[in-house]
């Protein structure tokens, strides 16, 4: 049985889980994740303590617990378990308080905006924009885009656009390059006025064929030779038009998004 890992937070737990994933990915080991969000009272802390100790009995080994609990009383309750407890606030906040000679706010949920903040509204607006401009659905207001992703079908444009919108508040449109564009040897007409905003995604033809076969098995659309043709033509077009691009084959969405932000010189806060 894989080791049990608890993600305990007084908020959504997104911060703690992201940190835990980064640390645990360094080990060639599968883990069983148990998320325990909104532990915002001592009663909930005691209930969490009980869950952790039950896991010790069931697994026959100590679980690992990542916590981001601001309330010291709740934190001490969870630390009373027999688990390996990794307290992110104690690890990072206390040394920073000493270094900065300041006391932190110790307020719960400060890492995520409320629905009435300007940052939150901007992020929702970016998500709506990206959804409305997914896969070339709309050509309206393309001038408002921060970036326009181009590439063949199934090269990773949609998930990257949505990640940029959700994580960074970037208005990311995406537009497919199709065989008709390659036959004409020109970019789609709606994109011609926005070259400076374009960024291309490519992908290994064999991997593209595998992905497309999941959607349309045995079709010309998914055939290896067709995928090679489309990728070769798309990359040639991007080079010809001076569009920066990268291969998404061996990159995570996070890596792709970070590279795009660097290349197009977009400086956005992560929410």
Swiss-Prot record:
Record-linked Pfam families: Kinase-PPPase (PF03618)
Organism: Paraburkholderia phytofirmans (strain DSM 17436 / LMG 22146 / PsJN) (Burkholderia phytofirmans)
Annotated S-S bridges: none
MF terms in GO: ADP binding; ATP binding; phosphotransferase activity, phosphate group as acceptor; protein serine/threonine kinase activity
Assigned protein family: Belongs to the pyruvate, phosphate/water dikinase regulatory protein family. PSRP subfamily.
NCBIfam families, alphabetized: PRK05339.1 (NF003742)
Function: Bifunctional serine/threonine kinase and phosphorylase involved in the regulation of the phosphoenolpyruvate synthase (PEPS) by catalyzing its phosphorylation/dephosphorylation.
Coiled-coil ranges per UniProt: none
Residues reported in the UniProt entry to bind ADP: 151-158
EC number: 2.7.11.33, 2.7.4.28
Catalytic activity: [pyruvate, water dikinase] + ADP = [pyruvate, water dikinase]-phosphate + AMP + H(+); [pyruvate, water dikinase]-phosphate + phosphate + H(+) = [pyruvate, water dikinase] + diphosphate
Protein name as catalogued: Putative phosphoenolpyruvate synthase regulatory protein
Keywords of the record: Kinase, Nucleotide-binding, Serine/threonine-protein kinase, Transferase
